[in-house]
Amino acid sequence: MEVSQFDNVSVVKKANLYFDGKCVSHTVLFSDGTRKTLGVIFPATLTFNTGAPEIMEINAGVCRVRLAGSEAWQTYGAGQQFDVPGNSSFDIEVQETLDYVCHFG
């Protein structure tokens, strides 16, 4: 899933701001109708709810993640990814700014 750029896309100009600016992303729209968000999460512990399934690809930084229904935290860093089921949630702990791509399923 690792690519360095996305070609022939549209980018929504307005940023998605969550948790008082602790998470900032922009939506990228592809010609086939799929979408992704490119964003950063600043140091915090946050809980995200999902509608569609998501694949979170980490570009830079390190995070700890706990999926809904799990007691265990998993650590992910640059070049790694984790899957989140649809209609679910996950906790994420970030100590230094995290750069990510969210792929929607």
Curated annotation (Swiss-Prot):
Gene that encodes it: ppnP
Function recorded in the entry: Catalyzes the phosphorolysis of diverse nucleosides, yielding D-ribose 1-phosphate and the respective free bases. Can use uridine, adenosine, guanosine, cytidine, thymidine, inosine and xanthosine as substrates. Also catalyzes the reverse reactions.
Enzyme Commission numbers on file: 2.4.2.1, 2.4.2.2
Name the record gives this protein: Pyrimidine/purine nucleoside phosphorylase
Keyword field contains Glycosyltransferase: yes
Swiss-Prot/TrEMBL keywords: Glycosyltransferase, Transferase
Protein's UniProt keywords contain Glycosyltransferase: yes
Pfam families xrefs: Ppnp (PF06865)
Group of enzyme by EC: transferase
Annotated InterPro entries: Ppnp (IPR009664), RmlC-like_jellyroll (IPR014710), RmlC_Cupin_sf (IPR011051)
Organism of provenance: Cupriavidus pinatubonensis (strain JMP 134 / LMG 1197) (Cupriavidus necator (strain JMP 134))
GO cellular component: cytosol
Family from the record: Belongs to the nucleoside phosphorylase PpnP family.
GO molecular function: guanosine phosphorylase activity; purine-nucleoside phosphorylase activity; thymidine phosphorylase activity; uridine phosphorylase activity
Catalytic activity, reaction form: a purine D-ribonucleoside + phosphate = a purine nucleobase + alpha-D-ribose 1-phosphate; adenosine + phosphate = alpha-D-ribose 1-phosphate + adenine; cytidine + phosphate = cytosine + alpha-D-ribose 1-phosphate; guanosine + phosphate = alpha-D-ribose 1-phosphate + guanine
